[in-house]
Regions:
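Periplasmic OmpA-like peptidoglycan-binding domain that tethers envelope proteins to the cell wall
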Residues: 38-40, 61-125
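Periplasmic peptidoglycan-binding/tethering modules of Gram-negative envelope proteins
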Residues: 1-57, 114-120, 125
Length: 125
């Protein structure tokens, strides 16, 4: 997986998106917050970008598919965000102050359920 960076015009507001890393998601198996080794390359590429651009931060937003209860989906989406953040911080040494975490529960962003089981990565100011 290669992460391409696209510069976007954005207002100067706090936490506004200034870059989007492509692909912008780390995907997960159903009811899992374990990062699959095939998805870790996306985390690695994100970390390399952060090391090359020490003035940027990331917003990680966790999602779940439509299966399960609202409560269960909120829990799993939060666990997914924490898994990605923990890897970025613990394994790769990025300062936790450069990470903003959020979780939304159910996502209908994509037509395929398996694509909605993800953490969306956005580079922010």
């Amino acid at each position: 997986t290669v992460v391409n960076v696209v510069r976007q015009e954005a207002p100067a507001a706090e936490n506004s998106v200034i870059f989007k890393a492509l692909p912008t998601t780390i995907n997960f198996a159903f009811n899992s917050s374990k990062i699959d080794p095939t998805q870790e390359v996306g985390v690695y590429n994100l970390v390399q970008f952060m090391k090359e651009n020490p003035d940027v931060r990331v917003r990680l937003t966790g999602f779940a598919d439509k299966r399960g209860t609202e409560k269960a989906n909120m829990i799993i989406s939060e666990r997914r965000v924490n898994a990605v953040a923990d890897m970025v911080i613990s394994k790769y040494g990025i300062n936790k102050d450069r990470i903003v975490k959020d979780h939304k529960g159910v996502s209908s962003r994509y037509d395929k359920d398996e694509w909605n089981r993800c953490v969306l990565v956005e580079i922010i100011k």
